[in-house]
């Protein structure tokens, strides 16, 4: 079932999009409601497409070598997720988990998302989001380089707050 184009209006990714692109996206997206800790998709294959958080929060998670979950990315209200894979030659598919009691997302499959990227404004928007992600990661790397102990401190903080973690 398609969503209404006005549901995408608050999303920054669609702010400067031409009406035809917004209509296309809305007509190819469907709404999914997730409970806390529920995985987006069928659970067998990681999500591969483009999505927008309409309510709640999602986290991309992976397992560490010792079997713990580690949050890689967080998508909050009105944020787009999955955009990096649309531009990558070798995408990294991520497992997205709802971290709010009630999370709603609008998603489209990879093929429709690739077609959406044929609109120049949408491809530029995805590139800008990706550039911001890279800058955020570089900033984090810079903090770790300047303060080598920070990686251990952050690991300790995560470990110490595990009982109160949003992933539990």
Where are these regions (language model features)?
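Short loop/turn motifs at secondary-structure junctions and domain boundaries
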Residues: 23-24, 40-44
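Short, solvent-exposed loop/turn elements at beta->coil junctions and helix N-caps
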Residues: 37-42, 145
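Cytochrome P450 core scaffold surrounding the K-helix E-X-X-R motif
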Residues: 61-67
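Glycine- and acidic-residue-biased ligand/ion/polar-headgroup-sensing regions
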Residues: 37, 48-61, 77-78
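Cyclic-nucleotide recognition modules
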Residues: 71-135
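Cyclic nucleotide-binding regulatory module and flanking cytosolic helices
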Residues: 1-36, 80-81, 85-87
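Polybasic "coupling" helices that flank or enter modular domains
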Residues: 121-168
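His/acidic/aromatic-lined binding-pocket segments of jelly-roll/cupin-type domains
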Residues: 31-32, 41-42, 48-54, 71-73, ...
């Amino acid at each position: 079932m398609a969503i209404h184009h006005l549901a995408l209006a608050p999303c920054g990714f669609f702010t400067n999009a031409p009406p035809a692109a917004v209509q296309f996206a809305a007509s190819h997206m469907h709404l999914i409601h997730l409970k806390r800790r529920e995985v987006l998709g069928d659970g067998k294959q990681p999500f591969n497409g483009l999505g927008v958080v309409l309510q709640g929060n999602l986290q991309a998670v992976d397992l560490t070598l010792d079997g713990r979950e580690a949050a890689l990315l967080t998508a909050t209200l009105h944020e787009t997720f999955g955009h990096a894979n649309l531009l990558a030659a070798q995408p990294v598919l991520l497992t997205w988990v709802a971290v709010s009691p009630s999370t709603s997302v609008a998603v489209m499959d990879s093929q429709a998302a690739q077609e959406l990227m044929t609109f120049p404004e949408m491809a530029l928007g995805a590139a800008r989001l990706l550039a911001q992600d890279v800058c955020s990661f570089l900033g984090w790397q810079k903090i770790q380089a300047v303060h080598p102990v920070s990686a251990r401190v952050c690991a300790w903080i995560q470990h110490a707050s595990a009982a109160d973690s949003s992933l539990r």
